[in-house]
């Protein structure tokens, strides 16, 4: 229904007054906002980039990555840092767990000489550092490892055994309110790593929950559940982990998709193995028996040899990566290489019993 002329004049006057008082762009028609096309940073995993629907993690937003111990949470965030640094972006790592290994980070491709790192004493200090870096407008990616290690000052100064009900949840809730707008204005990606706890007395449904209350769940644009589902072996020697990531929440594309990839010890995500698997699935790589061929040329017998060929020929790997991204991310007709999660997972994934 068309708005009558008087209402249009009144609306135009109101919009003019708002823009005069709060600045241009403070209010706009949703269809006119071209900035809705969100800039993203690759996760280092092609299948996860595709599962996210936009080609990576969104800039200017909050992301939560959670899972059990040794599931690959920190590795995934270090791969994000490496990808961001390759694009010339500035990154910071807030190491609240005091457990960051610079040698391992360097092996994953992180430029440790240009990585800002802080090991804060309290949770409040960590979040204030995040806010200061964000307001500077000069930092593109901030990692907080982890929410569970963001200990409130009152708890640190108190005695072991003292009750501090809801302190961490209140601290996180206040920080989210303060950070969300600044992150959008600075176009900074803030990633929180989180741990899993078990809810006591749950008879039905998922007993797992994450630490830090409900605020992070609400403010996060993307939530990723990462799990180790098996071992990668070279003969009898375990050389890595089979990893599955489920997109529990996604505000920039369809949620509840999942991706599977390998994390090799000392190397990180096996991107070349992903290229082989996705290339075969989408008929860019031919597979005859145990042999793999690309553009008519044999590239190896067995997946491991084909992956090594791509590792030794980065130009071919980059070409294959580009073709797959164009096919699967830019409106191509290729079949989506990610499976929808079950309804049971979707219903139970966001449950929590912590105070807001």
Swiss-Prot record:
Organism: Yersinia pestis
PANTHER family (alphabetical): MITOCHONDRIAL DNA REPAIR PROTEIN RECA HOMOLOG-RELATED, RECA
Function, in words: Can catalyze the hydrolysis of ATP in the presence of single-stranded DNA, the ATP-dependent uptake of single-stranded DNA by duplex DNA, and the ATP-dependent hybridization of homologous single-stranded DNAs. It interacts with LexA causing its activation and leading to its autocatalytic cleavage.
Annotated ATP binding sites: 67-74
Any one GO CC term of the record: cytoplasm
Gene3D superfamilies referenced in this protein's UniProt entry, alphabetically: P-loop containing nucleotide triphosphate hydrolases
Pfam families with a match to the protein in the record: RecA (PF00154), RecA_C (PF21096)
Gene: recA
Similarity comment text for this entry: Belongs to the RecA family.
Keywords, in A-Z order: ATP-binding, Cytoplasm, DNA damage, DNA recombination, DNA repair, DNA-binding, Nucleotide-binding, SOS response
HAMAP family linked to this entry: RecA
Annotated protein name in UniProt: Protein RecA
Compartments it resides in: Cytoplasm
Annotated GO biological process: DNA recombination; DNA repair; SOS response
UniProt keyword Ion transport present: no
């Amino acid at each position: 229904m068309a708005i009558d002329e008087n209402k249009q004049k009144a609306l135009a006057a109101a919009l003019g007054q708002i823009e005069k008082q709060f600045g241009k762009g403070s209010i706009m028609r949703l269809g006119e906002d071209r900035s809705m096309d969100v800039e993203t940073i690759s996760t280092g995993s092609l299948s996860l980039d595709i599962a996210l629907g936009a080609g990576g993690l969104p800039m200017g937003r909050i992301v939560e990555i959670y899972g059990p111990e040794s599931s690959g949470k920190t590795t995934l965030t270090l791969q994000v840092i490496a990808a961001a640094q390759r694009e010339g972006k500035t990154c910071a790592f807030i190491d609240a767990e005091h457990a960051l290994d610079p040698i391992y980070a360097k092996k994953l491709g992180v430029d440790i000489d240009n990585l800002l790192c802080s090991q804060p004493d309290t949770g409040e200090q960590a979040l204030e550092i995040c806010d200061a870096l964000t307001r500077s407008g000069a930092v593109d990616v901030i990692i907080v490892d982890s929410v569970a290690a963001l200990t409130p000052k009152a708890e640190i100064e108190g005695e072991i055994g003292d009750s501090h009900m809801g302190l961490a949840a209140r601290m996180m809730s206040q920080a989210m309110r303060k950070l969300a707008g600044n992150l959008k204005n600075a176009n900074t990606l803030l990633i929180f790593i989180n741990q899993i706890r078990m809810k006591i007395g749950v008879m039905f449904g998922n007993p797992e929950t994450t630490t830090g209350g409900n605020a992070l769940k609400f403010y996060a644009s993307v939530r990723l559940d990462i799990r180790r589902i098996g071992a990668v072996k070279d003969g009898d020697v375990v050389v890595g982990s089979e990893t599955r990531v489920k997109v529990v929440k996604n505000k920039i594309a369809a949620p509840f998709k999942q991706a599977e990839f390998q994390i090799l010890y000392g190397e990180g995500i096996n991107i070349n193995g992903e290229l082989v698997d996705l290339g075969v699935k989408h008929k860019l790589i031919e597979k005859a028996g145990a042999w793999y061929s690309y553009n008519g040329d044999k590239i190896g017998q067995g997946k491991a040899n084909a992956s090594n060929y791509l590792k030794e020929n980065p130009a071919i790997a980059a070409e294959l990566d580009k073709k797959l991204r164009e096919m699967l991310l830019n409106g191509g007709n290729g079949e989506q290489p990610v499976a929808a999660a079950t309804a049971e997972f979707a219903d139970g994934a966001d449950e929590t019993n912590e105070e807001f």
